[in-house]
A protein has these predicted regions:
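Structured, solvent-exposed acidic/aromatic patches
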Residues: 4-20, 24-169
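A short, hydrophobic C-terminal helix/tail in secreted or cell-surface proteins
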Residues: 170-175
């Protein structure tokens, strides 16, 4: 999604890609701590088969910057193709709320670290609701709804076989 949309200058799709990247990689670093990040996903293009591990602080700094950038990329002039948007059906406002709510979640995770300046950043979000819209009700949640009928049983496709996930093989093309 992101590579094609960069060429087309679809800033909303770029913002969504940054948001989903932050969601997935924040979950990974929360589970595993330090992990490959800066050199991750460069095996094919740059032949880095054993990426070095980065500190969790470096990862969080980068993800928070990505979310800040994503928040500024959303525009009402650029549309999101509702057929490609499985979570919000093309609603830019809901995507922006998701991005900023995720931003708050990550700031809360690092709230005990003074060097991350999370208290000031959290305060900025709450004091500027027009600049940083956030979830206000359950209607804003990012919920993937399964229809239960073919071909719409699992919209993300079958990515696992015998408990082995193949998502990591396709992730570089998505990002």
């Amino acid at each position: 999604m992101c590579i094609r949309d960069r060429k087309e200058e679809n800033t909303n799709a770029q913002a969504i890609a940054l948001t989903m990247k932050a969601l997935y990689l924040s979950n990974m670093t929360d589970l595993f701590g330090d992990m490959p990040f800066k050199e991750a996903f460069k095996g094919i293009d740059e032949n880095i088969m054993q990426p070095k591990f980065d500190d969790q602080k470096v990862i969080y700094d980068s993800l928070l910057m990505d979310l800040e950038r994503a928040n500024t990329l959303y525009t009402k002039t650029s549309t999101i193709d509702a057929k490609r948007d499985l979570l919000y059906n093309g609603d830019v406002t809901k995507w922006r709320k998701f991005t900023n709510s995720l931003y708050l979640r990550l700031l809360m995770r690092v709230s005990n670290r003074r060097d991350m300046n999370s208290a000031e950043r959290i305060k900025t979000v709450f004091e500027n609701p027009s600049q940083y819209p956030i979830f206000e009700s359950n209607d804003d949640n990012a919920t993937l709804k399964y229809s239960g009928t073919r071909p719409f049983v699992n919209d993300f496709g079958d990515n696992a076989t015998d408990a082995v996930s193949y998502t990591h093989l396709t992730l570089p093309t998505i990002l």
